[in-house]
Amino acid sequence: AVFSAAAAGIWQLNSTPVQALKPLELDPSVVAAFSSSPQAVAIQAIPSSEPEPSSQEPLPEEASSEPAQSASGQSESAQTPGALEEQPRVTSAYFDDAVFIGDSITTGIKLYDVMSNTTVLASTGIGLENILSKPAIKYGEETLTAMQALAKTGARKVYIMLGANSILGDHDTMVGLYGNLIDEVRRNAPDSIIYVQSVLPINEEIFHVKYNPNTDNSDIMDFNTKLAALAAEKQVYYLDVGSVFRDETGGMPADYTPDGMHINSAQYIMWFDYLKTHAIAAE
């Protein structure tokens, strides 16, 4: 997936405009892997066919505090696994012990400093077919697979977003690979709450010109439907993050994306705002 940081306003969490990003020409050979751990903040360059976003000046972040809970003291078991409904809002501190696993879309969490207290294990070009086998994560002095790195984090929440790079593949095969990934996440982070995030919609008009005229949002919706069913089967939580980015046509608005697929910096704030209202309060 090609990530480009287009001109977009960067917004604080209170929606006050503070800065506009300038379009950048990106180096297609760079693969980024990040962690908030002092031992694991690095950029790794490995061959890749797609660029990733360049880092910009950090976005102001909401002050971290203790997670909010409902008056009833909502616990991890209060919501049935599967599609997660809106929950009492948590604060930024909820993500202190969270890990985000994904591809170039996920790398933007660190590159734009949207949630600096969280850990990101992501690489441009990573997909369901190689996430378990490809050593693409620079962790300390080591280059590890995502699962090897995950095992070192002590994560209590794990967020996964994968599938965009192979949406035209056989969806049943992709879901099978996703199931294997969930099993491995559970094995390497046994005490974690696992969240499976939907594949984001595309802006078809832009995407068809830049990438592939054969991909449309119906393909993405079909995959997400199967992904939600898998989450229920595996007893993990499904988050329809894509709902934040769908307009009345079911696609992504043109002003949300520089290339029809990736999102601008302001949309990362929208993403985390959704996550804060769709979270299970850990016991």
Segments the model singles out, each with a brief description of its role:
Residues P88-L177:
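Conserved SGNH/GDSL esterase-like catalytic core that processes O-acyl groups on lipids
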Residues F95-D97, G154-V158, A189-I194, K234-Y237:
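Loop/turn elements at helix/coil->beta-strand transitions in domains of secreted/extracellular proteins
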Residues A1-D97, T106, L111:
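N-terminal secretory targeting modules
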Residues L132-I137, A164-T173, V185, K210-N217, ...:
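Second-shell loop/turn segments in exported
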Residues Y178-I182, N224:
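Generic structural signal for well-ordered alpha-helices
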Residues M161, N165, R186-S218:
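Active-site segments of SGNH/GDSL-like serine hydrolases
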Residues I202-E283:
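Catalytic His-Asp segment of secreted/periplasmic serine-dependent ester chemistry enzymes
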